[in-house]
Amino acid sequence: MNSMLMGYVRKSNAGGALKVNLSADAFDKAQRYLSKDGEEFVGLVVNIDHVRAVMEGEKEVTSISQISD
């Protein structure tokens, strides 16, 4: 299994939203899959405990990754 860093998640300056930032280069290189209706997607993974820590102010940022075979 391989993991590729795709970007990061952080709280907005106002604190009412999460900001998601993806590397355009990583996104271009990311593995894609087709849904049953033929739409193309890029699957991403974020650790939910780390997102909670960002939301609660315990962490400033957490990573977004893609896991592939």
What are these regions (language model features)?
Residues 1-69:
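Single-stranded nucleic acid-binding surfaces, predominantly the OB-fold ssDNA-binding core
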